[in-house]
Design a protein with these regions (language model features):
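Short, charged surface segments at domain edges that flank catalytic/cofactor-binding sites
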Residues: 1-16, 39, 74-76
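Histidine-centered nuclease catalytic patch
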Residues: 16-47, 56-72
Length: 77
């Protein structure tokens, strides 16, 4: 098992927002928001720019009408 951390998520996602492709002002996004029971697991965390994170807010990507360019996954060693 590879431990989850911000740098590893960014690296997995090629340091780009999974919603718009921006490489600026990167943050982490919970696909299923934490406030709605989302976990801190690899498959629920993605790289997201600040703008898209604000737009998505407390919604799922579907609810926010935002498409992910990649599906989050657990990387291999």
């Amino acid at each position: 098992n590879i431990r989850v951390n911000r740098t590893r998520i960014y690296k997995r996602d090629n340091y780009e927002c999974v919603y718009c492709g921006s490489k600026k002002q990167l943050t982490l996004d919970h696909v299923i928001p934490k406030s709605r029971g989302g976990s801190n697991e690899w498959t629920n965390l993605v790289t997201c720019c600040f703008k898209c994170n604000l737009k998505k807010g407390n919604k799922t990507p579907e609810e926010a009408k935002m498409t992910m360019t990649v599906k989050p996954y657990v990387p291999s060693l």
